[in-house]
Amino acid sequence: MKLAKKWRDWYIESGKKYLFPLLLVCFAVIAYFLVCQMTKPESYNVKLFQVAEKTIRSPQTVEDTEKTKEERTKASDAVEDVYVYNRETGQNRVALIQSLFAYVNEVNAEAQEKDTKNKEKAKKENKPAPAPTSTEDKLKNLKDKLSSNVSEKITSNISDEVFTTLIEAKSKDFNVMEDVVTTEVEKSMENKIRDENLNSVKIRARDDIELSAIPAYYKNVSKALVSYAIVPNEVYDEEQTDARRKEAAQSVVPVKILQGQVIVQEGQIVDRETYRQLKMLHLLDQKMPVKQYAGFAIFIIALAAILFLYTKKQTQPKAKKMQTMLIFSSVYLVSLFMLFIILFLETQNIANIAFLFPAAFAPMILKILLNEKYAFLSVIFIAVTSLLTFQNDATSGITIFILLSGATSVVMLRDYSRRSAIMLSGFMVGLINMIYVLLLLLINNSTLLQVSTLMALGYAFLGGFGAFILGVGVIPLFETIFGLLTTSRLVELANPNHPLLKKILMKAPGTYHHSMMVANLAEACADKIGANSLLVRVGCFYHDIGKTLRPPYFVENQLQGINPHDRLTPEQSRDIILSHTKDGAEILKENHMPQPIIDIALQHHGTTLLKYFYFKAKETNPDVKEADYRYSGPKPQTKEIAIINISDSVEAAVRSSTEPTMAKITEIIDGIIKDRFLDGQFTECDITIQEIKIIRDTLIATLNGIYHQRIQYPDDKD
């Protein structure tokens, strides 16, 4: 995953400049290489498992690299892994736990001393006794001490709940915990612990804690501490292991085939080993005619040109076109490689193995990642390629099968928001593949009641169903590498039980409700203008997650009559409000959310002005800069974010309105849209004036339905 992330980062930052022309070159070269390999003619002189017509000797002395490698691998594998036991690791972990308990004692003692002094001082001055030091202050003090004097990692690896429990523990219980946990860590670390048995040691330690004298309330905390403290103390020494294995491998004498050595005698059966040696000595090579090489080159160039011209016609940004071509070519090349494997299996005389080819793999993936048109295009590409590569009597039948199977997968795959629906489509494609094979066998007047027919049907089903299984497994890899956001991933993110959504609900319920309302408004607008409504809805769910860091400072989370901004300067309030977009983007990045969701959190306010605090600051400082009170942006880069930009402001403004009549709602919406236009907030995305008009009308209709005036019925008096 780290490699995929590095690739994606390079692709986002630099790849857009260089990858577009390089894409076609790589696509053409690799495809050309595979096609040439698949169509390379077989030798007619020597065949596997057949009798050699004459004695063949080695024309030269060469190293049998495969045999040498095999022997060296055996020698290397025979060397056992080297592990180094470090006793100091155990001592250090015990000392770490002891330090933790010591600092908890120290923090409590300091707090007690401070509270005593404060009480005495207040008593002398005839003032009310001040509140004792809070647990939060003690927790901060403890974490500062641990970070400074022990390790910064300890505060990030042990939860605040554990620290708080230790701070608040009674002296007697605390001492019991300290004794038992320290003893358990010391006892556990006396064992030789590797990564393989680390979990079992931790489980045993936690079981000991469960049976210990520690009060039940503190057992989970104690278990957490021993789990953190117990680490491997016998570490795999990669350097020594590699050195010993390298030494063992190098000690192996290279296996050689000597000049004049008999490879196969006349009349002898050519087995796999003999055949391999003949290939290694290039005694089976039979070059293709130059015209054939040229023909394949023209074929690949034609495919690349079709893909290029078709993609060029699409109304997409250049970077998006590049990504589309890269995805298409990658999937095509994977299919080509699968075709290569099937052709190899054919050389092993496995009857009807061609029907095992997963023709549905490429169209299934491309329909989910791109669209239906690219899926059908891949079917044509693969079918035409198979026409060139399957060089036997059944070539046309296999090509027709691939064409039908691929097209069927595109038609059958309708609901791909759920994995179960995808797998059901794959099962249906497998069954339909069996029908296609039966039809082809009937057309060829083949005998149906034989084992090879049953095998062909089985291969056809496995090829269809297996293609979908492979596709489901590969799609997350494409999502990671290219930063894609598929429908299934969006549905997953829309689940109310997602940890981040639960976090918003628990920490900022007002923001959660606001986000749901904005999602309903924005989704309706996206549907009307043909934008990605699911992306808009899910993006709204997470767009204000940055507010969870300081919920009370945002109006929707404030209790009636309590506004913490009353105690702050405009500058302080500005910093808190403006930071929620960046904070949200950071939270989403830390949780490995897709880039489009991160972009929504970062861009949903664009570079708009925080007017209230700007004018408030201007009252005391006329020279205040407007730029200092604008969001850092960037401005919305897509029409989906532009929709959220408008809907977010409209929802907040209408909700704060005392009388949201239809006239008032219309006035608010028109004012916000006009303000955004005059401020140039939509200059960097592809949204049109006509689309904004549709958004306006949709917002008016939707909000009027929510806030419409109800008929007031008179009270029913007896």
From Swiss-Prot:
It catalyses: 3',3'-c-di-AMP + H2O = 5'-O-phosphonoadenylyl-(3'->5')-adenosine + H(+). Changing H543A: Decreased Mn(2+) binding, decreased c-di-AMP binding, no c-di-AMP hydrolysis. It comes from the Bacteria. Residues 1-17, 311-324, 414-421, 479-718 are cytoplasmic. Its EC number is 3.1.4.59. The lineage of its organism: Bacteria, Bacillati, Bacillota, Bacilli, Bacillales. The cytoplasmic domain (residues 494-718, expressed as a maltose-binding protein fusion) has c-di-AMP phosphodiesterase activity. Mn(2+) 1 binds at H514, H543, D544, D648. Mn(2+) 2 binds at D544, H580, H604, H605. Residues 112-127 have a biased composition (Basic and acidic residues). Residues 112-140 are annotated as: Disordered. Its main location: membrane. The chain crosses the membrane at residues 18-38, 290-310, 325-345, 350-370, 371-391, 393-413, 422-442, 458-478. This is Cyclic-di-AMP phosphodiesterase PgpH.
